[in-house]
């Protein structure tokens, strides 16, 4: 359970950094075991499940339309999802799936519970259906996930949920296509995947990655490269800079704002076209509106895009004001920035033990009467004489 809590905490920490809201209800599957057992019992009573080899299986032959997402024919399906998955001889059909395990290939399974069929644990699919039905009710509007969840996971969720409930379960399914790199699909199993901490280590703000994702439609595969992310980082920085330059003043013109709102709304209503929504955001900056109205629209739009634009713009203004106040008398902001850059370069040279470069920069600063001091709070500098 400590391992599960570690990854739960890490997940929600990453979500916060990426501008993803935390769900109002967060429950571990281990707290819903009674719900899963009840669902399996009902499926057995209704004839949608059978017991074999100590396990309880869902009988997909009892459904007229099991392959609900289309483009999948029984004859063309390989046994299991991955090549490493062995055929289960207890199944009546290769498309059947486990609702409750008492025996499995995982001999070291630690978490097990008593059930009418013996000590065991729930199948992967029944967990998602059970938690959803328990906390969200018998009807869902939207269910989302990656495209690789469409089959078998979401297909099996639909099968067991509608068999259990006796009516349609979910109105809309939302599947996001894969993130790719130059070699193809990125995945944990291949050992080539991104983490938020890795991006941060490389100097990228998580919200820059969010903007990178929003630039593409969810129905299209997204090809990742650090070059592309660099371009997005530059675009994000420029966008924030333009917003930071706006002043919350000017006349209000609701009639002029409404077409821009309509454009943003139309983009989202067009199958959640976030790329067009970003275009609508940029249109606000180009529009003939007061700065106050522009800021109001940006706030509205960013409640959806969640790019932290106003917060980043405020931080940039504060940084710019601090830099202005820190410029010594008689020196321009450009000159002060040049000195800061030289000091940063000297620091990197010292870390790399490039003493020649470090000494050359020190001499250049001294020639300009710049005194550099190392303090516990960091490096400071001043003009002497």
Language model segments and positions:
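N-terminal, positively charged nucleic-acid-binding surface of large information/translation enzymes
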Residues: 1-19, 372-377, 381
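Generic structural signal for residues in well-ordered beta-strands
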Residues: 24-26, 142, 372, 381
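Conserved acidic
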Residues: 2-3, 120, 273, 338
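The substrate-binding groove and active-site-proximal loops of carbohydrate-active enzymes
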Residues: 1, 24-30, 118
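Alpha-helical recognition segments enriched in aromatics with Gly/Pro capping
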Residues: 6-13, 18, 22, 33-245
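Aromatic- and histidine-enriched alpha-helix N-cap/loop-to-helix transition segments
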Residues: 31, 123-127, 272, 276-279
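Structural preference for alpha-helix termini/caps and helix-kink/transition segments
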Residues: 185-188, 193-385
